[in-house]
Amino acid sequence: MKRLALALKQKKVASWKLEEVKELTELIKNSNTILIGSLEGFPADKLHEIRKKLRGKAIIKVTKNTLFKIAAKNAGISTEKLEQYLTGPNVFIFTKDNPFLTNMFFENYKLRRYAMPGDKAEEEVIIPAGDTGMPAGPILSVFGKLKVQTKVQDGKVHVVKDTVVAKPGDVIPTEALPILQKLGIMPVYVKLKIKVAYHEGLVIPAENLKLNLEGYRSNIAEAYRNAFTLAVEIAYPVPDVLKFTINKIFKNAITLASEIGYLTPESAQAVISKAVAKAYALATAISGKVDLGVKLPSAQQTQTQQSTAEEKKEEKKEEEKKGPSEEEIGSGLASLFG
């Protein structure tokens, strides 16, 4: 630091630069994460809004790239891997927070600004009905070009009805720009573009900072569903699984009881139904040779009954395969996603 001060003194560097480097050095030392954002195309006057939002969470500094590099060196950080990002006007964000969550804030936080020539509309740009506060005069012809119906009342221009002057994707008409400004309409969204993050020695480019939360949620839900199905199959002894496991075991026991004719209050209906079905099948097989003196169901009825029984079996199998419902998965993930 003494060498730097001496070198700067010899070159007659302004004292504010010395103070700036000193402040930046302390910020770098006391921050877990540093994000570098581009100020190209971003209104500098909008930074105060971001500062207010991040107050207590991050410190935002606009400084020269050369001063940042000197400060980083003083703090014991090599800027070799950051060189490609230290071009053009930049803003530096110093924080102790996670770089991914901090970047997500900038991804989602959009600010409005007035439209400039060549800007495209992201949503419908509407001139609303009512008093514009503009005196009648040449401005009427501008409204006419934009096909905005007007009337003059008390010497002021009034818009008759809400009028769309640009749809999403359209270039906002140049004629509309001064009118939109006078009406205080800011139709263009801007956000601070993060170039890179430096976190505890790691350099993380912007493309690697983006979080696909919906994708993560879907993957976790799928993993939970698969784990739950496996847990039911192996009868893993936890409360959420056991209610499904016990139900499955009970169904399997009833099926086995009906096959071997084991009679209990719970299996009685299944055992008797199975016995009746076998009796009818046997009676049908010998009815052509022996007069049994009973009326047997037709082949079609028997087939229908068998089909119905098979469908019920299939439904049971499907229910077992499905495992937990979406609601149950949701409650299971509640602790993860709040």
Swiss-Prot record:
UniProt key word RNA-binding: yes
Gene Ontology cellular component list: cytosolic large ribosomal subunit
Coiled-coil zones: none
Start and end residues of each stretch annotated as Disordered: 297-338
GO terms, molecular function: large ribosomal subunit rRNA binding; structural constituent of ribosome
Compositionally biased region (Basic and acidic residues): 309-325
Superkingdom, taxonomy of origin: Archaea
Regions of compositional bias (Low complexity) in chain numbering: 298-308
Record keywords: Ribonucleoprotein, Ribosomal protein, RNA-binding, rRNA-binding
A GO biological-process term: cytoplasmic translation
Role description: Forms part of the ribosomal stalk, playing a central role in the interaction of the ribosome with GTP-bound translation factors.
Family in the record: Belongs to the universal ribosomal protein uL10 family.
Subunit structure: Part of the 50S ribosomal subunit. Forms part of the ribosomal stalk which helps the ribosome interact with GTP-bound translation factors. Forms a heptameric L10(L12)2(L12)2(L12)2 complex, where L10 forms an elongated spine to which the L12 dimers bind in a sequential fashion.
Identification of the protein by name: Large ribosomal subunit protein uL10
Species: Saccharolobus islandicus (strain L.S.2.15 / Lassen #1)
Gene it is expressed from: rpl10
